[in-house]
């Protein structure tokens, strides 16, 4: 049975202060109607429905004309993001009305620029597909018909003049873990989209999130007790980084793309209207109707409430106010960080408390400032919440700093000789030991095209826009609101929402919060039943390989071209035993322990090789000398140099440095401080975190 959709008047909202005049929306005599992807109406349909279907043909020209405001608003949002038609762009396409509407607008935007280029350039030749635009359909493989649907969507996107490809998902256990299907599917989907963008040298990915999605996320986070930063919803522009560094032919680099959501000013109804007005078909995902998922339950509740007065418009005003506050917080923490934080080459940060002046920084900005520093140092990208957030705030405001604190994967203490005016932020050894196998990995030398350089220029333009926007704002509504309830009450006091909207939001919050608590207990019980200790995988490194230790240090072992000329004994008859063992095998990577610098001191203090070999109390970490005085003299010189470097590094930071050992546990190399047991070991370590400070660029305009 075909389903008809009614298209009413078009009233897109635009908050980006553009200068595009919106033309008056024509009111057709008969509202245009359009079928979704259902079969065409047949003779067996009632006469009234058949007449309604046929009337679309007579009003399609009017509907097409009425899409002008959408095209203008889309172009304005893209310009606000610093993105121009000449940029190479990918579009995430599911085949639903949202992503198909995005394809319609992106295609028209690109084509308009192409027509202008054709008019300005002699001999311009257009291709079958829109230049610099790629649609990507991710087939999750969770339903039997998903492959057929993916091919159908791909063909429809190509029919619009947009090149499109399908990315299939492979699940280790056949499908995601029960209870986490949506989260797992989302994670895999973005990973597939990211991989294709990197492979195709595309720096921008468009996603079709709209204002109704923002309202759903607002209620969802409200039920989880999120503060104002979480209630700000999804970023307009954000940076997404690959989980692994990649090789560009010369060096290992951090690869990433810009995730742009240009449809946040449009509603779900607008998505249908754009598809209808462009005669574009779509599919409906049946899982969107399942009440198993919180998003779907919230969507249904919002749909029921949206018919009552000004409820939905009040919610959107509240979200806009939260986004304004978030923009201010991001601007403020960046300004403070530039003045008060130093990042050292050994992988730790130093906070200057006198320059920070934490007693005069509001809780919201200071919490975000500290959260970003801790996430950067630990490369543990989880939000700082609850007790941890309160602990770190109290700690940083205690001046002078005298105590130590372990929180969120980091160890904080007073910097030596600073009299408590500076705080060290180092990666926690406990966190490293529990997570080393998860976030340490060998790097692949499969060559990738260089990262897209134009991203830097886009980010620069976006930062200028955001800074100018926030500097022109004198009132910030929720800077001092500490909880979601505080935000709601403040919004009521400021007349952002009325009493009715406040009451309904509190009801939605309580209703979904109760379901969340019940589900959390179920998941906790399930997780306890399924608890298994992770395998204790040891990260090993062979000659010619590179690894990323804790996603923080890039360690590269270059094999020497002519080992025999480098590593011969004084009598030039045979190689040192220690070099032969390690250069023909592999080394294990671990973090530094206190005994390691004691070992370096012992090596420097030993008077002779013979005494070292005959001492039964010698450290187990000592290297066998094998009657190699030349090597031992080099070993002592290297240990002495390493100790000099080590003295400039605080003890807490030393413990996070990478150490390489052989199979017997003997220390072979500590590359960060220049120690190696033999000159033939060409190993170096560079602090190169996977994600930069602040998690990359984001905009909430």
Locate the predicted segments by residue:
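Core alpha/beta nucleotide-donor-binding catalytic domains of modification enzymes
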Residues: 2-304
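AMP-forming adenylation/ATP pyrophosphatase catalytic core
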Residues: 2-12, 21-26, 31, 69-75, ...
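Residue-level detector of alpha-helical recognition elements and their boundaries
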Residues: 117, 121, 200, 230-233, ...
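Eukaryotic basic, amphipathic alpha-helical target segments in cytosolic regions
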Residues: 161, 306, 377-381
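Short, surface-exposed helix-loop/turn micro-motifs enriched in polar/charged residues
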Residues: 207, 286, 290, 314, ...
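Residue-level detector of well-ordered alpha-helical segments, enriched
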Residues: 214, 314, 365-369
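Internal, active-site/partner-interface "lid" segment
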Residues: 288-293, 313-323
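Inter-helical turn/loop segments and adjacent helix faces that build the functional surface
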Residues: 305-314
């Amino acid at each position: 049975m075909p389903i008809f959709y009614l298209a009413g008047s078009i009233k897109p909202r635009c908050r980006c202060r553009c200068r595009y005049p919106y033309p008056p929306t024509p009111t057709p005599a008969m509202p245009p109607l359009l079928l979704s992807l259902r079969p065409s109406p047949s003779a067996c349909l009632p006469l009234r429905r058949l007449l309604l279907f046929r009337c679309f043909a007579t009003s399609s020209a009017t509907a097409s004309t009425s899409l002008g405001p959408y095209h203008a608003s889309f172009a304005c949002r893209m310009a606000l993001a610093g993105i121009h038609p000449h940029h190479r762009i990918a579009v995430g396409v599911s085949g639903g009305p949202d992503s198909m509407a995005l394809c319609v607008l992106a295609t028209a935007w690109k084509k308009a620029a192409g027509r202008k280029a054709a008019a300005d350039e002699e001999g311009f030749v257009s291709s079958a597909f829109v230049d610099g635009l790629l649609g990507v359909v991710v087939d999750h493989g969770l339903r039997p018909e998903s492959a057929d649907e993916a091919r159908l969507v791909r063909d429809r996107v190509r029919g619009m003049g947009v090149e499109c490809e399908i990315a299939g998902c492979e699940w280790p256990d056949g499908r995601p873990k029960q209870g986490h299907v949506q989260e797992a599917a989302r994670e895999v989907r973005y990973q597939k989209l990211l991989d294709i963008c990197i492979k195709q040298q595309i720096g921008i990915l468009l996603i079709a999130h709209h204002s109704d999605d923002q309202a759903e996320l607002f209620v969802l986070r409200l039920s989880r007790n999120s503060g104002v930063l979480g209630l700000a919803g999804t970023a307009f522009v954000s940076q997404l980084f690959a989980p692994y560094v990649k090789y560009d032919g010369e060096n290992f680099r951090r690869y990433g793309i810009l995730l742009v959501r240009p449809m946040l000013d449009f509603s779900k109804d607008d998505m249908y209207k754009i598809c209808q007005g462009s005669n574009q078909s779509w599919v409906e995902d049946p899982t969107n109707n399942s009440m198993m998922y919180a998003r779907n339950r919230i969507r249904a509740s919002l749909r029921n409430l949206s018919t009552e007065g000004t409820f939905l418009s009040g919610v959107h005003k509240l979200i806009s106010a939260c986004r304004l506050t978030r923009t201010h917080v991001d601007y403020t923490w960046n300004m403070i960080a530039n003045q008060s934080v130093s990042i050292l080459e050994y992988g730790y940060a130093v906070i200057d408390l006198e320059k920070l002046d934490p007693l005069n920084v509001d809780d919201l900005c200071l919490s975000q400032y500290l959260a970003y520093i801790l996430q950067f140092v630990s490369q543990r990208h989880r939000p700082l919440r609850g007790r941890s957030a309160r602990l770190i705030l109290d700690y940083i405001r205690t001046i002078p700093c005298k105590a130590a604190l372990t929180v969120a994967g980091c160890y904080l203490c007073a910097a030596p000789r600073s009299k408590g005016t500076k705080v060290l932020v180092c990666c926690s050894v406990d966190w490293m030991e529990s997570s080393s196998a998860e976030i340490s990995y060998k790097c692949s030398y499969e060559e990738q095209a260089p990262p897209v350089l134009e991203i830097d220029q886009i980010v620069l333009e976006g930062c200028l826009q955001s800074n100018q926007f926030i500097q022109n704002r004198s009132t910030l509504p929720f800077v001092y609101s500490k909880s979601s309830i505080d935000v709601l009450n403040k919004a009521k006091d400021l007349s952002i929402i009325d009493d009715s909207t406040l009451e309904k939001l509190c009801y939605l919050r309580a209703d979904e919060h109760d379901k969340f608590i019940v589900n959390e207990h179920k998941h906790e019980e399930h997780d306890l039943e399924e608890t298994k200790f992770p395998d204790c995988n040891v990260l090993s490194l062979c000659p010619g390989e590179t690894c990323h230790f804790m996603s923080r240090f890039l360690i590269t072992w270059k094999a020497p071209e002519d080992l025999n000329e480098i590593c011969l004994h004084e009598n030039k008859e045979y190689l040192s035993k220690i070099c032969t063992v390690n250069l023909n095998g592999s080394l294990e990577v671990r973090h530094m322990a206190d005994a390691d610098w004691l070992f370096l001191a012992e090596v420097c203090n030993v008077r002779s090789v013979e005494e070292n070999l005959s001492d039964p109390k010698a450290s187990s970490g000592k290297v066998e000398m094998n009657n190699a005085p030349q090597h031992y003299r080099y070993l002592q010189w290297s240990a002495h140099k390493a100790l000099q470097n080590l003295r400039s590094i605080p003890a807490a930071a030393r413990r996070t440095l990478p150490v390489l050992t052989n199979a017997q546990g003997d220390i072979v190399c500590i590359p960060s401080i220049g120690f190696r047991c033999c000159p033939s070991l060409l190993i170096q370590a560079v602090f190169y975190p996977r994600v930069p400070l602040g998690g990359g660029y984001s905009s909430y305009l």
